[in-house]
């Protein structure tokens, strides 16, 4: 079976058409990644490398485990994800889902205002 003519024409347009929207999206993701990295590394107990081409940060959150956070204590990043979602209403994927206990995956594929609000909620929760 072959690729349909419509799909071929659409693919050609996608790679040969105006790519300014792609450049704008890339700039937005770079800006959000830098912002999220800065906000995460300002939280005591969190260390994070700058994202390199991804749409998420993958910080080490081991410094938050075993601590009183919002009156509760998480012993792993899965428990921490539940605690943060329950109390701060911020969602992240625990590192255990990627074979990396003690880490967390925070997506920055969202608007700037929502990103800042979420990181501020997380920081407020951790700082008590």
Predicted features and spans:
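PLP-dependent class I/II
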Residues: 1-128
